[in-house]
A protein has these predicted regions:
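Extreme N-terminal starter segment of soluble prokaryotic enzymes
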Residues: 1-4
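Conserved N-proximal alpha/beta basic substrate-recognition cap immediately N-terminal to
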Residues: 8-112
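Short glycine-rich anion-binding loops that position phosphate/pyrophosphate groups of nucleotides
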Residues: 54-57, 138-140, 281
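Rossmann-like NAD(P)H-binding beta-loop-alpha module
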Residues: 105-131
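Protein kinase-like catalytic core scaffold
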Residues: 133, 194-195, 260, 274-276
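Phosphate-binding site of ATP-dependent enzymes
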Residues: 147-252
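A short glycine-rich, hydrophobically flanked beta-strand micro-motif that places a catalytic Asp/Glu
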Residues: 173-174, 184, 257-269
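C-terminal active-site "lid" helix and adjoining low-complexity regulatory extension at the edge
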Residues: 239, 253-257, 266-316
Length: 316
């Protein structure tokens, strides 16, 4: 069995690869920051490919990955290679606008949001959103480029200075103050909740990504890994209400996410639950045995092996 791990980050798949290799499996990390494929080559080179492409790749000088991943994944799927977190998954992963559209279609409560692609539309959208509000790039990644504005006047004054990210699309979103400063991430694997964690910020730094538990300092982008979350986060295992679990499973299913997380918060003002992010790049929580009481990587590896096994039986 030959397993491909599609990941441009040099560290994020290290634990997964170690788990798979520990089982005697052949694993290749596919660095698609410098890569190519021939559409005429119809040979499947892997029994299964795990797509771990992250929207934050552009923060590490790998912006081409954002656009290259889609045709590469489509090519692999056309060859019949099972892909965990498929090309459909990637489309949702890299677009917060698509995620918001999914929330709306499924009837999931989320912060009021308007999608824009220019300064003029952003300024006009300020009339339709309550403040404080956030401006988020459509292509996110580790909380980068998110700006908070207390008033419409403040936004109007700074709108022309904002960086909308690699595709020039941004979201203007009502800021919901989370109760106790906490958010919850529900991690889903193969259609079931694997675990949930409660994350509380201990820093005023806003460009923080509780999704993959990392920050991306401008001076050292490769430091963006879960291990570095400790100075700014309190992370504990959490048992979310069943409704939140079912909602997370429904969202991941609708986005074709085989492994990923759904993040929500409870509003401090109204006590209502708001979903605000779906993330398909699962690095899992740092020091999982201590925080969770178990290591999630064996379960992830089991899912990968099962996917390859199903494909082999179909081919036979």
């Amino acid at each position: 069995m030959r397993i491909g791990i599609l990941d441009e980050h040099p560290e994020w798949s290290r634990r997964l690869i170690a788990e798979l290799e520990g089982r005697g499996l052949e694993v290749e990390r596919i660095d698609h920051s410098e890569h190519g494929f021939d559409p005429r080559d119809r040979r499947p080179h892997w029994d299964v490919v795990v797509n771990r492409t992250s929207p934050s790749s552009h923060r590490r000088g790998h912006g081409r990955v954002l656009f290259y991943a889609e045709p590469l994944l489509a090519h692999l799927e056309a060859l019949g290679v099972p892909v965990i977190n498929s090309v459909t998954t990637w489309r949702f992963e890299k677009s917060k606008a698509l995620q918001v559209g999914l929330f709306e279609r499924l009837g999931v409560r989320y912060p009021r949001t308007v999608v824009v692609n220019g300064v003029g539309p952003l300024r006009r959208a300020a009339r339709d959103v309550r403040f404080p509000a956030l401006v988020k790039p459509n292509v996110g990644g580790s909380g980068a480029l998110i700006e908070r504005f207390e008033t419409p006047a403040e936004l109007q004054a700074r709108a022309a200075e904002l960086d909308f990210g690699p595709d020039g699309v941004a979201l203007l979103q009502e800021y919901i103050e989370p109760r106790d400063g906490a958010i919850v991430r529900v991690e889903v694997l193969d259609g079931r909740m694997l675990y949930a964690i409660r994350i509380v910020r201990r820093s005023d730094q806003f460009n923080l990504c509780p999704a993959d538990l990392c920050r991306v300092p401008a001076s050292d982008a490769l430091a963006a890994c879960p291990v570095d979350a400790a100075p700014v986060l309190d992370i504990t295992r959490h048992e979310p209400p069943q409704e939140a679990v079912e909602q997370a499973i429904a969202l991941t299913r609708a986005a074709s996410i085989d492994v990923g997380g759904v993040e929500y918060l409870v509003g401090a003002a109204d006590g209502r639950t708001y979903v605000y992010d779906v993330n398909a790049t699962s690095n899992f929580v740092a020091d999982a045995p201590r925080v969770l009481g178990f290591d999630p990587f064996p379960a992830f590896a089991d899912t990968i092996v099962r996917a390859a096994g199903r494909a082999a039986r179909v081919a036979a």
